[in-house]
Amino acid sequence: LQLLAERSGRIEYEERGTTTLGNPYVLATISSPENLARLDRLVEINHQLNDPRGLSEADAMALAQEGVPFYFLYATIHSTEVGNTQTIITIAHRLAADQSPEIAEMLDNVVLLVVPSQNPDGQVLVIDHWYDTKDTRYNRVYPDLYHRYTGHDNNRDWFMFTQKETRLAIDIHRDFKPQVTHDMHQMGSRGARIFVPPFRDPYDPNIHPILTEGQAQIGIAMASALISAGKKGVVYNDQYDLWTPARQYMLYHGQPRILTEIASARLADPLINPSGEDQPLGPQTSRWNFP
């Protein structure tokens, strides 16, 4: 990301602070050069619209027309879900280098806030352990907590804010007021290839219906785009609910929270299909929410 920022006018690289173990907490801001040149003004608009008291409806509409939405994307809060950070780098490279009209339109109409790893400490621990034990009988998932204090439960800290990494993410929310947050995860390897919203029941009754509807609209748009591109294994309204307040900070502050769960690999080892190499992996029967 640092190299892309050096060579492209579409990316700004920033280290927002340090993590529990002293690693950098990175934010990449990606948009058109024109949007990045007026980033302060776009952030000012977001703050005005985030708290519109004193704005007339006409003023609010004018600000919305002048501004562009901010989309906050973060990956690998769970450090054994290694594919997402790798994907972030690929996405950033495409947005920095692709000269197609499609990418130009995206960059003109959105500011993407990218945190490549929400738990950099765990990523270092998991990756170093894999390399240290590669080709030995001890090669397996990192055997200890991959966050020093919270382990896998670091994404249940969005209402207590006990950890440095959570507070660094909250600072991004406070500074930029993004319209959408997207949390990238990985799930089991034998089911669907990707989960997108809408979520299954139960739903937290404290979430405003317009936000649950916004999540559903964005998720279904993602599913439709994937299916139209010939991608198989998309599931929605399944597995993941919207109940616990432990991860609802974004929704309690007026943003749809998009969760994606991608089928897992075995870290950097080959994933062998237990049904046989020539057999499909995962369920093959269509359902209304698994076309």
Task: Label each residue range with its predicted role.
Residues 1-35, 40-44:
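A non-catalytic alpha/beta surface segment that caps or lines the substrate-entry region
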Residues 8-11, 23-25, 67-70, 108-113, ...:
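Loop/turn elements at helix/coil->beta-strand transitions in domains of secreted/extracellular proteins
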Residues 10-17, 101-105, 233-238:
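Surface-exposed patches in mature extracellular/periplasmic domains of secreted proteins
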Residues 14, 26, 58-62, 245-251:
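Short, surface-exposed beta-strand/loop micro-motifs that present aromatic residues
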Residues 16, 30-31, 117, 157, ...:
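Structured loops at beta-to-helix junctions and adjacent beta-edge loops in soluble globular domains
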Residues 21-27, 123-126, 244-247:
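Short, solvent-exposed polar/charged micro-motifs at secondary-structure junctions
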Residues 31-34, 42-77, 82-217, 224:
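Active-site/substrate-binding loop(s) of hydrolase catalytic cores
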Residues 162-168, 172-291:
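C-terminal accessory segments enriched in acidic
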